[in-house]
UniProtKB/Swiss-Prot annotation:
Protein's UniProt name: Nuclear distribution protein nudF
Database matches in InterPro entries: Dynein_regulator_LIS1 (IPR017252), G-protein_beta_WD-40_rep (IPR020472), LIS1_N (IPR037190), LisH (IPR006594), PAC1-like_LisH-like_dom (IPR056795), WD40/YVTN_repeat-like_dom_sf (IPR015943), WD40_repeat_CS (IPR019775), WD40_repeat_dom_sf (IPR036322)
GO molecular function list: dynein complex binding; microtubule plus-end binding
Ranges of the WD repeats in the UniProt entry: 113-154, 156-196, 200-247, 250-289, 292-352, 354-393, 398-428, 429-466
Main location: cytoplasm
The organism of origin for this protein: Aspergillus fumigatus (strain ATCC MYA-4609 / CBS 101355 / FGSC A1100 / Af293)
Domain notes from UniProt: Dimerization mediated by the LisH domain may be required to activate dynein.
Taxonomic path: Eukaryota, Fungi, Dikarya, Ascomycota, Pezizomycotina
Regions annotated as coiled coil: 60-87
Cross-referenced CDD domains: WD40 (cd00200)
Annotated gene: nudF
Composition skew (Polar residues), residue ranges: 422-436
Keyword hit for Coiled coil: yes
Amino acid sequence: MSQLLTARQAEELHKSIIAYLASVNLTESSAALRAELGDSVSIDDATLKKYEGLLEKKWTSVVRLQKKIMDLESRCAALQSELDSATPTSLLRKNQDPTSWLPRSPARHILEGHRNPVTCVAFHPVFSSLASGSDDTTIKIWDWELGELERTVKGHTKAVLDVDYGGPRGGTLLASCSSDLTIKLWDPSDNYKNIRTLPGHDHSVSSVRFIPSGAAGSPMSGNLLVSASRDKTLRIWDVTTGYCVKTLSGHVDWVRAVAPSIDGRFLLAAGDDRIPRLWDLSSAETKSTFLGHEHVIECVAIAPAASYPHLAVLSGLKKPPPASSSAEFFATGSRDKTIRLWDSRGNLIKTLVGHDNWVRALAFHPGGKHLLSVADDKTIRCWDLTQECKCVRVISDAHGHFVTCLRWAPPLIKDGGANGEAETNGTPAATSTTNGVRPDPNVATKISIRCVIATGSVDQKVRIFAT
């Protein structure tokens, strides 16, 4: 003991032990220790009172420190792994290539204002506006660049479950859906006035997405919206009239998530029946089903064409599908804690294991090389499709509670002007799953990836991760 502690430390330890023994009524043990220590320790009632509880505090402090050390060691190992997987070029590159950018802690902004869990987020396709929905029944509009609240949108009477920007070109709308069985359309250009309410579902509306131009060959496809519901159906709406133009039935339980293909021809939907379905909108029939998940499916994502070369290698194809094709590869996330990658024929390509709780949202990197996921384990994970889907980054402190949603800011298209100079027209790129509009083939275009993601959580906060 003398080799480890100074004389003063040893004396304090002895006093703490004596005080502890006295506090738990081990008087004989306390007296025996005092007698054995003799005059080396002077202790009276006041000293006993002073040192009472000190030993327990020291003990719990040690336990807390051990946990912090373990957390730091885990974080250090993750950073070392990230460093090992980085190339010398990427380490030296000051302005990182946006096609390989990945989010990292800390978040640029933490947006606070909701009074209940945040359930959904969506980026405006042009401006620096972000919409978030919550169990508190409100939608909040933020300036994600400044980290400031712009307005609170009220109208739903129960939890807001999903939001999405889209609609006709030049007339962007915000759609929201809720446990109150309705879908609402809001006009951002008119102070987010509620311009239409779409009733029709018989239960909670879980997900809503605008369908990109070209859906089913319809000239009015830019006006189409798809919704998924606990009533087991998908509904297609014309936002200009408010009419439901098609109902897709086939799921046998709650449909929780839906994603349209970039050309609007297909829909991927999944939910409590654990069977994702790829729907052909022109025929309103299921094209493929995907079997493998062992629990409720919370989220789905359709891979962009930029991911085809990497996913083709994983699936064993000699060459990737043409970039002009859509709905070739998919990702699904489940309460079974796994992410599964599929091809359009329903074949399982890869199972991604790493999350310790329900997987809640997915987003393919617009650059095509990565897939991002969030889960109830409070983490964001980045999977590298070029490295057998290795998890190359974990943001373990993404939120203080379950992470419920994730969205990537849609890329922008820059159209070449008459003089050949690129001019940003504010059109979301064709690689975006939000209001994806195909660029004019007669005009030179350049896709500009925005390195920004947003996440929401049960901790009632929205976090912005950006360059």
